[in-house]
């Protein structure tokens, strides 16, 4: 049986990445809240998603 979470770095970055957040008013609100709260990572883009080390 196939489970719900089928990880893909590209999909993750496109849906939850910085540029995706900046593209909508709601996303910008998310970023400002996370800045205000002092989150170490604002978005998943800060995880070096597509990078091969």
UniProtKB/Swiss-Prot annotation:
One of its GO terms (molecular function) is structural constituent of ribosome. Keywords: Ribonucleoprotein, Ribosomal protein. Coiled coil: none annotated. Transmembrane segments: none annotated. One of its GO terms (cellular component) is ribonucleoprotein complex. GO terms for biological process: translation. Gene3D superfamilies: 1.10.287.3980. Belongs to the bacterial ribosomal protein bL34 family. NCBIfam families: rpmH_bact (TIGR01030). PANTHER family: LARGE RIBOSOMAL SUBUNIT PROTEIN BL34M, MITOCHONDRIAL RIBOSOMAL PROTEIN 34 FAMILY MEMBER. This is Large ribosomal subunit protein bL34. It comes from Leptospira borgpetersenii serovar Hardjo-bovis (strain JB197).
């Amino acid at each position: 049986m196939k489970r719900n979470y089928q990880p893909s770095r590209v999909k993750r970055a496109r849906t939850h990445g910085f540029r995706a957040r900046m593209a909508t008013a709601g996303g910008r609100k998310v970023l400002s809240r996370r800045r205000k709260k002092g989150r170490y990572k604002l978005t998943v883009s800060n995880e070096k998603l597509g990078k091969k080390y």
